[in-house]
Amino acid sequence: MRRFPWAFGIGLVVALAGCGKQDGASSGGSREVVVYTALDRSFSEPILDEFTRQTGIAVRAQYDTESTKSVGLANRIRAERERPRCDVHWNNEIINTLQLKAEGLYDVCDPPEAKNYPDAWRDPDGMWYGFAARARVIIVNTDLVPDEAFPTSIHDLADPRWKGRTGIAKPLFGTTVSHVACLFASLGDDAAMAYLDSLKANDVQVHGGNKGCATSVANGATAFALTDTDDAIIELESGKPVRIVYPDAAEDGIGTLFLPNTLAIVKNAPHRKEAELLVNYLLSAEVEAKLAACPSAQIPLNRSAEPNPRVKGPSQVKAMQADFAAAAEAFPRAREVVEARFLK
């Protein structure tokens, strides 16, 4: 496998800034890197601005929109495959990342910071790296659900006691469809389809997104719902009557699903050296700490980073042993089943 050399440390970049034109530099001598990021602009932009302050490398960022979730930027990378404009793809989930890898749209990279990540969050072929995760959790309204009736599993959304009073995000985009694909890979098609059928039979409320799930529970319109930690923590920390449950974390459970942000360098990236430096910077414990401290409370995966005290990570709660590659393969089947059950 071909590996690429890396410059160790941001300081080296600054030291070399005046040493003549670098690869990817414009005729004026400035250096830049193009990143497509699906993480909310309010969270990702300050991180990218800090990279520029430390290195002098200008970051040209293309941000995703809420309406297209992470799919819009993935499709843009596909459309530009003959003449790539993007250097670094910063995705906020993993299934589209694996699909782009399978389509040959990423290149191998070997950032020094990757050694601080467990194997579960690194592509064995060196084409993507996971960091700054979210957990798939159940947000519960404590005014509506007594302690003794608290859900402990994603299967509790299909409990007849709560018919019509539980919720999920529309399972066609983002982390929700990624979760469904992981269930197909982990449980098998039949069991995953049976689970989706049980949700539909229980009149689960389908919201436009995970934020809608969280606000519905916080406002008392729904008793409990499946969502992401970043949306749940906002309601919890704003003082709403809610608690966060990490589902299926008992010894005999399948575990709570953690879904990372991912980083990859696009094949034939125009600014390869700058892309390598940006990826290594984003994987640093410093960046994970900043993302953990922001309102979305991202979960650090770098072993050198301190755990986020606001939410639990995979070292603190039983984590689902998700086979993301198998989930990506199952995705087309999962989406077909979802469309048949929730769009008709």
Task: Give the location of each predicted region.
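A bilobed periplasmic-binding-protein/Venus flytrap-type ligand-binding module shared by bacterial periplasmic
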Residues: V137-L144, A181, A185, F258-H271, ...
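A structural signal for short loop-to-beta-strand junctions that line the ligand-binding cleft
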Residues: P84-H89, D107-I138, H155, R165-I168
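Periplasmic-binding protein-like
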Residues: A133-R134, Y195-K200, V206-H207, K240-R272
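Mature extracytoplasmic/periplasmic domains
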Residues: N261-A322
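Early extracytoplasmic/lumenal segment of secretory-pathway proteins
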Residues: C19-L98
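Ligand-binding "clamshell"
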Residues: L100-V108, D119-G126, E235-D248
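Short beta-strand->loop
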Residues: Y36-L39, Y63, P124-W128, V140-D143, ...
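Ligand-binding pocket segment of bilobal, Venus flytrap-like solute-binding proteins
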Residues: P171, T175-S178, C182-P247
